[in-house]
Amino acid sequence: MNHYGARAQEHWRTHLPRQLATIPDPEAFFTLLGETAETEIEQRAEALAQLKPPAEGYLEEMARLTTARQLAEMEVMRELILVDPDNQQAISQLLG
């Protein structure tokens, strides 16, 4: 399980214990969730990084790529990893 899966598992343990108890194989669930999050972050960061301005220098490029990664990670963390305990629709979607 990667760090995204471990972070999600801890979040569910703290904020969604009843829902966590319904998962037959938490290890497999959070392993897959972590892998999905990592893939989604990479894809979103890559898409965001495509917006390259002309005459960009090395430092500007590094800042753009770092910002793209951070934005993608923030979005995915909110959607998949640190799901709002009050958002029953998102929780149901994650549980399948």
Model-identified regions with their sequence ranges:
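Extended, charged helical/alpha-beta scaffold domains that provide interaction surfaces
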Residues: 1-96
